[in-house]
């Protein structure tokens, strides 16, 4: 049976959605209709939200799952009248944390995501700009400033991984696509050799690579299984020859790939 899940907040909804998605992902056999509802910051909006929740409960024949990070007590009381299974993230964790720290929390909306009070904001922007400027081997003369350089065949997940590490951790990550010439020579390009200690390889199952490339260039040599199988085989040979640590991205999320890379390379996050 498909269930409905709401991620509700009187701020951006980032925290409710992130934690909620992580928890729901543990129930792989259950399909969910997921809805994010940010800025539920007035009583009128809260009452309208209750109507949405109750309508979903009536439609589905089972109550929706509600993840919320609402700070305002009056709004929380309105939300509690809904026919939903409520998981109040702040009240669940803040109360025991207040007891442990013997201090009251500020109950500030959007505190962790604010720009003005966040010293990490410019670090994040600079890391994202670095990832974009050094994407797909477009520029190589700034590799000395890179924390990491991801290498692999085209369309194996290098770009989204670099951007995720930039946005979440302030990591300056470049990426370089290894070409058919590189593979046939079984040699790293000269520009990568001098930065060997920063290299990390991504590989992927050939059938998955074929499907991804087919969406971009259908019925082409580039997207053929034979070509994808050749490139993956040769790039893995190159990784072994050059002793480049690597991971197969096929069955991992970008979050998991990023975490594994940082652990294996021993790269410290600029912020957490």
From Swiss-Prot:
Record keywords, A-Z: Kinase, Nucleotide-binding, Serine/threonine-protein kinase, Transferase
Catalytic activity: [pyruvate, water dikinase] + ADP = [pyruvate, water dikinase]-phosphate + AMP + H(+); [pyruvate, water dikinase]-phosphate + phosphate + H(+) = [pyruvate, water dikinase] + diphosphate
EC number: 2.7.11.33, 2.7.4.28
Disulfide bonds: none
Binding of ADP, residues: 152-159
EC main group: transferase
Gene Ontology molecular function, alphabetical: ADP binding; ATP binding; phosphotransferase activity, phosphate group as acceptor; protein serine/threonine kinase activity
A Pfam family assignment: Kinase-PPPase
UniProt record similarity statement: Belongs to the pyruvate, phosphate/water dikinase regulatory protein family. PSRP subfamily.
Function: Bifunctional serine/threonine kinase and phosphorylase involved in the regulation of the phosphoenolpyruvate synthase (PEPS) by catalyzing its phosphorylation/dephosphorylation.
Matches recorded under HAMAP family: PSRP (MF_01062)
UniProt name for this protein: Putative phosphoenolpyruvate synthase regulatory protein
